[in-house]
């Protein structure tokens, strides 16, 4: 590794006519160098095979267009500390950015759209930051898979994806944080989270097929999320998941249950759950020894809380039925009309 800055490290100007993969592999690029991309349309796939390379857009007009023929726009195979910042990526047949193995990458402020696979895919990698990216019309917006751990997914926007907005898939994908992201109008889930000790905090999930799925693991935490307008299910905890904490979330105007818990030893605490179309909280037949405490439930039909499980503890919840002639659909349809502009605005990015 080079340690003496001016003698070894460089800012290298790059144009669309240059083969970036070949440039990185050449003796002209060393660890720690910055590739400063001139504005223009780049038709190429870039494999970054050296550590600590920073690939930075010089302006907003840096566009990587795969023209529906190239696979991944950027491939980071078993390298460390790569930064990709400020690039528009569109029309690739695989993923916008694929991280395989390695660790410590920074994926920041990119706009990724129209991938056949995923916006950002992280495979068997750890300690990555995925921050302030806007992802539209991919399969999953951000996918963590095959034992990806200790990743930070913060302030990203995923809209109109064919799969999930954000996903940590299967039990080995643990110790990840999803904070202040927006998932809007995705076909499947806003957040599909498998694994242990994951954090879901202050995310906004609007008009997705389903809001949140929690499966295969234990000890994950969800605090301060807003879930509204789901069609298939809202917040589902699967049988066999232990010690999940759901606290301080706002769950309103969803077609099915506000929270469906089929797991064991969960804590459902101080949530606001209102105007959902198929119970506020459903404790399924496999649920056992869960604590449901200090929640506020308003006009969920047919019941605010439906306990079908074993030895669940329901304490100090505030429950209010619907007013006469009031239904969730009436209230939610009015709210949707009034809030339409704010929802559309939220899909444009994180301020």
Give the residues covered by each predicted segment.
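Parallel beta-helix/beta-solenoid
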Residues: 30, 50-51, 59, 78-79, ...
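Glycine-centered, small-residue-biased loops immediately flanking beta-strands
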Residues: 33
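Right-handed parallel beta-helix/beta-solenoid
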Residues: 1-24
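Leucine-rich solenoid repeat scaffolds
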Residues: 279, 283-330, 334-343
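Extracellular beta-strand-rich solenoid/capping regions of secreted or surface-exposed proteins
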Residues: 21, 25-30, 41-56, 63-104, ...
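Short acidic DE-rich linear segments
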Residues: 350-351
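Short glycine/acidic-rich loop motifs that flank beta-strands on beta-rich extracellular proteins
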Residues: 42-48, 60-73, 93-98, 116-123, ...
């Amino acid at each position: 590794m080079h340690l003496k800055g001016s003698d070894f490290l460089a800012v290298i100007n790059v144009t669309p006519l240059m083969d970036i993969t070949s440039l990185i592999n050449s003796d002209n690029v060393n660890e720690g160098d910055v590739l400063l991309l001139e504005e223009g349309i780049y038709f190429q796939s870039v494999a970054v095979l050296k550590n600590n390379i920073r690939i930075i857009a010089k302006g907003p007009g840096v566009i990587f267009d795969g023209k529906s023929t190239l696979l991944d726009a950027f491939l980071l195979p078993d390298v460390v500390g790569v930064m990709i910042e400020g690039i528009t990526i569109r029309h690739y047949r695989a993923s916008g950015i694929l991280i395989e193995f390695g660790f410590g990458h920074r994926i920041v402020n990119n706009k990724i759209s129209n991938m056949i696979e995923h916006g950002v895919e992280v495979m068997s990698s750890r300690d990555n930051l995925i921050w302030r990216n806007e992802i539209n019309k991919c399969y999953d917006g951000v996918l963590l898979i095959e034992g990806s751990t200790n990743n930070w997914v913060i302030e990203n926007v995923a809209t109109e994806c064919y799969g999930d907005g954000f996903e940590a898939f299967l039990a080995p994908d643990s110790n990840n944080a999803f904070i202040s992201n927006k998932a809007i109008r995705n076909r499947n889930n806003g957040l599909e989270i498998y694994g242990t000790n994951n954090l879901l905090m202050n995310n906004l999930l609007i008009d997705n097929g389903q809001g949140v799925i929690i499966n295969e693991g234990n000890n994950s935490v969800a605090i301060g999320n807003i879930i509204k307008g789901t069609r298939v299910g809202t917040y589902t905890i699967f049988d066999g998941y232990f010690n999940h904490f759901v606290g301080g979330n706002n769950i309103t105007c969803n077609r099915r249950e506000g929270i469906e818990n089929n797991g064991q030893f969960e804590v459902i605490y101080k949530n606001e759950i209102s105007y959902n179309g198929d119970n506020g909280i459903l404790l399924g037949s496999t649920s056992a020894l869960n604590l449901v405490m200090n929640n506020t439930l308003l006009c969920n039909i047919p019941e605010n809380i439906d306990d079908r499980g074993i030895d669940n503890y329901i304490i100090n919840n505030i429950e209010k039925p619907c007013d006469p002639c009031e239904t969730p659909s009436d209230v939610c349809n009015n709210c949707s009309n009034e809030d339409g502009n704010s929802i559309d605005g939220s899909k444009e990015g994180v301020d």
